[in-house]
Amino acid sequence: MFKLAAGFLVFLALWVPTALAKDRLASATLVLFNSNDAESAELARYYASKRSIPAAQVIGFDLPVAEQITREVFNRQIADPLRNQLIEKGWWLVRLLPDGTTRVFDTRIRFLALMRGFPLKISSDPSIELPPPMEGIPPEVSGRNDASVDSELAAMGLPDFVPGGLIPNPYFGRFTPILEESVSPGLLLPSRLDAPTAAMVRKMIDDSIATEKEGLWGWAYVDGRDISSGAYIEGDNWMRKLVEILRQSGIPTIFDNLPETFQENFPITDAAVYFGWYAGDINGPFLREDFRFRPGAVAVHLHSFSASSLRNSANHWCGPLIAKGAAATLGNVYEPYLPFTPNLDVFQDRLLAGVTLAEAGWMSQRAISWMGVVIGDPLYRPYQAWNQFSDPRSRQENPFRRFRSITRSSRSNILLAMLPIHEATMETGNSMFLEALGNAQMDADHLPPALDSFREALKIAKDPEVQARLELEIAFVSRRISPEEFQEVSPEETFAEESDTQEKEVDPSLQKPKEETPLDWLLNLPYPDL
């Protein structure tokens, strides 16, 4: 009897904090849909029921069905009605200032779930008189009033909100969950449940909720460009930092630091995390008919127009990534300029800390009232299970969990874990352990040990896709060790090199963006640096 009582108390200790957190998140969420789109209304009800969001917090708006709207439509049919409801229902507490304006000083709402059918972006309107630009901000930024609907909603409760240029994001780089923050009561965190089809949106919702129970497990793939100087180095710095964060967290990671994106013949398996740049449309292995991300996956490709439309499975990146099974991504609806795209290392770091997708997404944005969108369930916490105690006897066998445990027990450095990695490989017969070690060794320029790890992994690999990838990795490391022996190796047998692509006709969408406008000023703007 005592054991039963003790077990029940342990269950309560684990369950109650999680349940309370879910209730708080649901109570702080509004679900917004397009009343003129039947699927939008149905998806709103579906999501609210899955997340236990009160029916009174599901709100329809009389809107066009197009993804792009005008500034006038945004103000009259979205911003003004939403602001009125927030105040009338007591979700925002406002104070009248001497100049006749109002200021939000307390809030009950922090999250907005925008359902498929809700407009995505606001077109530029040259007739709008713009306010004077902030000091140091050039006209390329301050002279624009196009924006994502989501980013405008994030900013509309702030005292310095104006329909032109960008606003420094008061939540950028923060660590604290928004419900524990005193920062800017008028700040809202929108996230968009949107995809090429309504069925894909339901899958995003279901996969997110299911993944939270055990956590997001699988491989991480990071695709850099080998940039070491110039205006675009910041993007590659994010990729390199991402690799460090992922490996220290115990996630097996493959880092492609060649100028091209992943080649089409590169096998990607068990993909839970993907970050890459810089191509206009989805390409490489993601085009394969049979490719799918793991349920709940987080996948982001950095590109200026990655979220220009979410209704197409073949163009841009955000829509196609969701169509391939990802549950969460980030994007831009118009040109944002590199410093005002999401800081991807901040994004992944905050997700790993256990905050929601919406929180991590907006923590990673230097600016709001700009071009960014967060796509996925705003309340999705892919790693919340990692940060909770659970009875190991109830866990399913999971080699990725064991890999994380080994890494964390080795001072978060997989290079110090060779013995336990080999022990896990012998006990499980799983090649993942040695392949992940080999990739870390390769990136640290420990080439002979990396070659040994890949060769040993190949001996036990059972999946043909994994075998093919290991053969590519072996060839790549061998070429680095003895380049003179591999001069005649065709690019199909190893990773493609820059010299190979220079002899072929290059797809314009894969080329670096033209640097017609000097970007030096972007590096000196008054926004916090990492």
Segments (PLM) and residue ranges:
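Long, low-complexity, intrinsically disordered segments
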Residues: V506-L530
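Bacterial N-terminal signal peptides
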Residues: A5-W15
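Alpha-helical linker/edge segments of TPR/alpha-solenoid repeat scaffolds
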Residues: F476-P491
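Boundary/linker segments of alpha-helical solenoid repeat arrays
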Residues: M432, K462-L470, E497-E503
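Alpha-helical solenoid scaffolds that mediate protein-protein interactions
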Residues: E423-T425, A457, P464, E493-A496
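Cysteine-dependent hydrolase recognition
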Residues: K22-M432, N439, D443-P448
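Sec/Tat signal peptide C-region and signal peptidase I cleavage site
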Residues: P17-A21
